[in-house]
Amino acid sequence: MAVIPIEERKFPKTLVLFDVDGTLTPARLSVSPEMLETLQNLRKVVAIGFVGGSDLSKQQEQLSVNGENVIDSFDYAFAENGLTAYRYGQQLASQSFIAWLGEEKYQKLVNFCLHYIADLDIPVKRGTFIEFRNGMINISPVGRNANTEERNEFERFDKGRKIRATMVDVLREKFKDYGLTFSIGGQISFDVFPAGWDKTYCLQHVEKEGFDTIHFFGDKTYKGGNDYEIFVDPRTIGHSVTNPDDTIAELKKIFNI
């Protein structure tokens, strides 16, 4: 489908950014046909982009249809909070977590986390407790290999026992001199990245693009959630949603699409 050039859209000075999990798709699941249609209609009137903590391959799995490259479906694609960034299909400069932190500190952090998780008493443990990404590490007490049913079970358990929140508090104190941010997101994990490398990082890529208005839609907009910083940032108009259906309803109401 041909894409209308931004300057020919109804609101060429407006950018709408989206979180992925819980906003455009159910957590770690694929985008719905209704959401895709809504985004296509929205792209006719404004510029659109996504910003997620996962690497681009995971966002490709969730947002791509029929093998289409996800970076072609959005004007801006920000993986790992914008540390891997694309503008109109062209990659921008990237950053590296490991180069910033250093191997020695990184290993101390990882070793502590693995020992901590080993001692946790939770219903199930699977695999991939720590996932290394370009701009952060993702830590999951249950393991990212958990299936959908196990993820749902852990999410319910975590709401009552505060497994992730407690671990984050411990890490903040233990590694307070590392200059790190700990941010809970999704169902089963939390992200660890340098202070300032939250989702607001992506805004540096669009600040000089001439937008008058930048909307952001996210579901983890509470303090400590991984959408909070960009949600409250003065450069954006934040919208808190509960699920993809809520996102669609809000978009139709705001942009009359």
Curated annotation (Swiss-Prot):
Record pathway: Nucleotide-sugar biosynthesis; GDP-alpha-D-mannose biosynthesis; alpha-D-mannose 1-phosphate from D-fructose 6-phosphate: step 2/2
Domain of life, per lineage: Eukaryota
Family annotation (SUPFAM superfamilies): HAD-like
EC number: 5.4.2.8
Broad enzyme group: isomerase
One GO biological process term: mannose metabolic process
Compartment(s): Cytoplasm
Its job: Involved in the synthesis of the GDP-mannose and dolichol-phosphate-mannose required for a number of critical mannosyl transfer reactions.
Description of how the protein assembles with itself and partners: Homodimer.
Protein name as it appears in the record: Phosphomannomutase
Gene: pmm1
